[in-house]
Amino acid sequence: MERKRFIDCDSTKILQELALNPLDLTAPGVLSAERIKKFSLLGGGFTFSFATERLDDAILAALISLAEERGLHESMLAMQQGQVVNYIEGFPSEMRPALHTATRAWVTDSSFTGEAEDIAVRSRVEAQRLKDFLTKVRSQFTTIVQIGIGGSELGPKALYRALRAYCPTDKHVHFISNIDPDNGAEVLDTIDCAKALVVVVSKSGTTIETAVNEAFFADYFAKKGLSFKDHFIAVTCEGSPMDDTGKYLEVFHLWESIGGRFSSTSMVGGVVLGFAYGFEVFLQLLQGASAMDQIALQPNARENLPMLSALISIWNRNFLGYPTEAVIPYSSGLEFFPAHLQQCCMESNGKSIVQDGRRVGFSTSPVIWGEPGTNGQHSFFQCLHQGTDIIPVEFIGFEKSQKGEDISFQGTTSSQKLFANMIAQAIALACGSENTNPNKNFDGNRPSSVLVSSQLNPYSLGELLSYYENKIVFQGFCWGINSFDQEGVSLGKALANRVLELLEGADASNFPEAASLLTLFNIKFR
């Protein structure tokens, strides 16, 4: 059945009308116990409160109707079953499924067929290979260095950091992404190369930043008299230039249908997490992620946490007109998580055409950013409360700390103070505070949602990762865009190569704009 475009949906028109007079969160009694209970949802181990969003029953009903008109449930089911979702009609495009969910489907009773089943089976095989590899070599190394960029660094780095306080380990972990040689040199200054394992991650096997950093490390190891094959392993697609067991100590695989920003539950994240914390920790992460994938298949948005959250974000973006969204985790372990979400959301949904090749005619991805609380309260929260731009916030919190070490100070523990601050911020943003002194007046009506679980551990981290991945995909399905390619990245790479040609002696007339900029900055290129 052919569906109406997002901009043409009946529900879109209703929501546009409702947006003219959204719920006033500052009105007396709005945040009642009844509303707080009603505007909440349980999803796996998480409780989601959206009582502090500017929506009511009518708006929520229209958003759910929008999900039905746009076929969000059917689209998610099609994606998880392996149908082609990465495409642009009538134009050359990747024409692939997006099967990151299959990389963890094998840990549950998920039953799929075709390519989804194939990727799930292959993922199980790779996981067993990883388990065997770690059993054999993990004790020989004290350090792992992961070389990769984009999804080969941001997701794995965020997950590793998130579990550092929960999972004791004697292993040291470093990530190298930037082509800036100082990035690699700083790490090499701190490690014992003889006890270091280097995992080189590139889906294509040709990523220039990764190749340069690999060469940088290989040269350093060689000067130390260390064999490349004894210390370097690869994670890449089957058949890529890096798929060479004659060169590497071991090669682990992912597949073309696994997008980089969605690849953390493949070997892209598995190798480093398994080395750092043990294979069982990685397995628990997969179990949590797969459980949330099942929730994402619920047809009713009121029972589907990532779908409902996606709809609320669309309400804020497309109908209330807010161009940015902050993700504020009240957990030090999640300090790198907003950066991962920034890539996952903005690279997926920062698109200006729908899948039939036409211009969208509406706003797509908001700018995603964030830092942990309470630190953020002492830096940018001033802007959230009294700035001229309204910035929706998604708070993430946990009932107890990871390590369980705490102190009672002035009648409450540190964990209680952390949680109290998060709740207070959501209420303050929503309700504001009137004051005759204009400098102390807070208008309120600044929307937020709050996502809470009992503790940040491998399983809940997997749930959280999957929640955001599925939320982002649901947004793309609703807008009708392709969330699984990244042509903007490709353009930048192509132009960078042309600049490099100038530095190698090419005629300046081949790229006069770049030549002029190089001249301005006194960069010699002839």
Curated annotation (Swiss-Prot):
GO terms for molecular function: carbohydrate derivative binding; glucose-6-phosphate isomerase activity; monosaccharide binding. Keywords: Cytoplasm, Gluconeogenesis, Glycolysis, Isomerase. SUPFAM superfamilies: SIS domain. It catalyses: alpha-D-glucose 6-phosphate = beta-D-fructose 6-phosphate. The keyword Zinc does not apply. The active site is at E347, H378, K493. Pfam families: PGI (PF00342). Changing V354A: In strain: CWL029 and TW-183. GO terms for biological process: gluconeogenesis; glucose 6-phosphate metabolic process; glycolytic process. Pathway: Carbohydrate biosynthesis; gluconeogenesis; Carbohydrate degradation; glycolysis; D-glyceraldehyde 3-phosphate and glycerone phosphate from D-glucose: step 2/4. InterPro entries: G6P_Isomerase, G6P_Isomerase_C, Phosphoglucose_isomerase_CS, SIS_dom_sf, SIS_PGI_1, SIS_PGI_2. Its EC number is 5.3.1.9. Belongs to the GPI family. Catalyzes the reversible isomerization of glucose-6-phosphate to fructose-6-phosphate. PANTHER family: GLUCOSE-6-PHOSPHATE ISOMERASE. This is Glucose-6-phosphate isomerase. It comes from Chlamydia pneumoniae. The gene is pgi.
